[in-house]
Amino acid sequence: MDVSYLLDSLNDKQREAVAAPRSNLLVLAGAGSGKTRVLVHRIAWLMSVENCSPYSIMAVTFTNKAAAEMRHRIGQLMGTSQGGMWVGTFHGLAHRLLRAHHMDANLPQDFQILDSEDQLRLLKRLIKAMNLDEKQWPPRQAMWYINSQKDEGLRPHHIQSYGNPVEQTWQKVYQAYQEACDRAGLVDFAELLLRAHELWLNKPHILQHYRERFTNILVDEFQDTNNIQYAWIRLLAGDTGKVMIVGDDDQSIYGWRGAQVENIQRFLNDFPGAETIRLEQNYRSTSNILSAANALIENNNGRLGKKLWTDGADGEPISLYCAFNELDEARFVVNRIKTWQDNGGALAECAILYRSNAQSRVLEEALLQASMPYRIYGGMRFFERQEIKDALSYLRLIANRNDDAAFERVVNTPTRGIGDRTLDVVRQTSRDRQLTLWQACRELLQEKALAGRAASALQRFMELIDALAQETADMPLHVQTDRVIKDSGLRTMYEQEKGEKGQTRIENLEELVTATRQFSYNEEDEDLMPLQAFLSHAALEAGEGQADTWQDAVQLMTLHSAKGLEFPQVFIVGMEEGMFPSQMSLDEGGRLEEERRLAYVGVTRAMQKLTLTYAETRRLYGKEVYHRPSRFIGELPEECVEEVRLRATVSRPVSHQRMGTPMVENDSGYKLGQRVRHAKFGEGTIVNMEGSGEHSRLQVAFQGQGIKWLVAAYARLESV
């Protein structure tokens, strides 16, 4: 039988992996080394050469998209339908298993999957029913606790509290939650895996059936597996199943959600005699980019070891740009993308990667100013994020009590005991009397028409809004915003949300404070109060909408979201200590190596051109900070990196200019370094200029007001 079509398009190491004998196998697949192709061709090899039935093959991926692509490529390669093969995610395959054996798993036939939002709502009700203070026992923290225990394979009765009252309370919440789910026939995502694992443990005949069936098991992205997923595969394989895992210890970046890079080493220990094949030839990046990636990751300890290489060109050196602040950084990136576009490149070929979602705001504004369409990959635009919309709704209600949409969003956020029944009365009164919701509340309270506890909670909420409006009216906008975020309870609510997600929400709220501080009026906003002008600005930015899916657009995403993707031109911004690596990774032991792996992932996304940027000073989370350049920059080979020098037309703050540097002047009549006075913002120094004539724009560093961009024709600046 001619099987050359399975091997001809592969390199030597890929062929070795595809045609390996049926035994346990680790394929250590470097970034861009063609691992999906190897998996697909291996499955085809098993069927065509080893005469394995599709019925005997299970292939596990981490996303539904990857599973669909694998099925499609197998079908294309084999030319026939592969019925009987199981290809899917861990959760998808566990769900399929539980549907087939629902009675043995003690589930009703029509059991339903509980998504994360439904899970959170159920926990809120249970915590309230248990008479627990939601502030002390946040539902989000309960959800994190329960999911973490399930990922470790633990039921409430397995957990050792050692007399710790906090642990005992969470244990009771977990128990009550599980009982509620069982009564209602509900299964959350973590439960799918745990219940399927328990099914096999408790019903040996079912386990034996699947062991005899699935004698060929293939698992992708093995470095991202958690404890229960590893146990699942280990149990299914038994002593006779043949397992091929594909992974890269250098790309393990999900430790914060339970992934265990150690599972690759566990596999080698638990499956004695397993062979290891390294895929090191890269088909994505230039030699310079790969040299940088190799040098970077070599600083990690305990690696299984591999070195990426390519037979392609050296390519351009990596560009390194030192910006004087985050605004300069954003403009530099946008200008580079514009040059790429002018030279015939597509916007969609450019990706901007950042460590924290909060960094996207300044980049989004720079792209909007340049009329450059963009898309946030795997996330929402800054002003569309939940925590930002919450904060803006408070500000909107302070500015206008009759804003019904804002009222609806925040009246019970954070939870303050105003239930749906009370709000239904308010809504009905609003409709019947043709009042706004705020007015309806006022009348119902005056008439004493609401129940005692609900009336008290509603009264306190209205007093809070009135007090914030009165007490913050004369504050600078950024101080007012910060005060509202704190006094509303939003900051406390999100501080109680465990893990990186909660930290990200806090960072975004602090970045909103920065946005209000940097906000400057447009000409059409001159007659508005600062808060009203900013709310208009925020609404317009949110209303811009993301680029249509068919539209050529710059791609913005976190480094985590970038995994598995590739782009001809990549920018990694915010390469500073405390930004990347993150402050959390510096504060917590054992996190730095995962940050370096994340940097490695970012670098290896670039195909042709990689640019790294850092800022000397950055207004971050409401305050000015000075960070050292990231240690990751210093770990790159000097011969691979080229520092971008500032042109004469790009200015740095006066404090950073060398003595004797001539001032730059444009036809607006203003000069760099010139001291000026603005009627609203006070005195400041011109630190940058762009455009000419009536379109000239000035960047002015104002004392106590921060750095602002102004249109020269409308700014009415006086020379000091």
Swiss-Prot record:
Keywords: ATP-binding, DNA damage, DNA repair, DNA replication, DNA-binding, Helicase, Hydrolase, Isomerase, Nucleotide-binding, SOS response. InterPro entries: DExx_box_DNA_helicase_dom_sf, DNA_helicase_ATP-dep_UvrD, DNA_helicase_UvrD-like_C, DNA_helicase_UvrD/REP, P-loop_NTPase, UvrD-like_ATP-bd. Residues 287-564 form the UvrD-like helicase C-terminal domain. One of its GO terms (cellular component) is single-stranded DNA-dependent ATP-dependent DNA helicase complex. One of its GO terms (molecular function) is 3'-5' DNA helicase activity. It is an enzyme of class 5 (isomerase). The keyword Ribonucleoprotein does not apply. SUPFAM superfamilies: P-loop containing nucleoside triphosphate hydrolases. Residues 8-286 form the UvrD-like helicase ATP-binding domain. It catalyses: Couples ATP hydrolysis with the unwinding of duplex DNA by translocating in the 3'-5' direction; ATP + H2O = ADP + phosphate + H(+). Its EC number is 5.6.2.4. The keyword Metal-binding does not apply. One of its GO terms (biological process) is mismatch repair involved in maintenance of fidelity involved in DNA-dependent DNA replication. Changing residue 30 to D: In uvrD252, UV sensitive, significant loss of DNA-dependent ATPase, helicase activity requires higher ATP and MgCl(2), nearly inactive on 96 bp dsDNA. KM for ATP rises to 1.2 mM. ATP binds at residues 32-37, 284. Disruption phenotype: Strongly sensitive to UV, ciprofloxacin (CFX), and azidothymidine (AZT) in single deletion mutants, radA-uvrD double deletions are more sensitive yet. Adding recF mutations almost completely suppresses AZT and partially suppresses UV and CFX sensitivity, suggesting RadA processes a class of intermediates that accumulate in uvrD mutants. A helicase with DNA-dependent ATPase activity. Unwinds DNA duplexes with 3'-5' polarity. Translocates on single-stranded DNA with 3'-5' polarity. Initiates unwinding more efficiently from a nicked substrate than double-stranded DNA. Involved in the post-incision events of nucleotide excision repair and methyl-directed mismatch repair, and probably also in repair of alkylated DNA. NCBIfam families: PRK11773.1, uvrD. Belongs to the helicase family. UvrD subfamily. This is DNA helicase II. It comes from Escherichia coli (strain K12). The gene is uvrD.
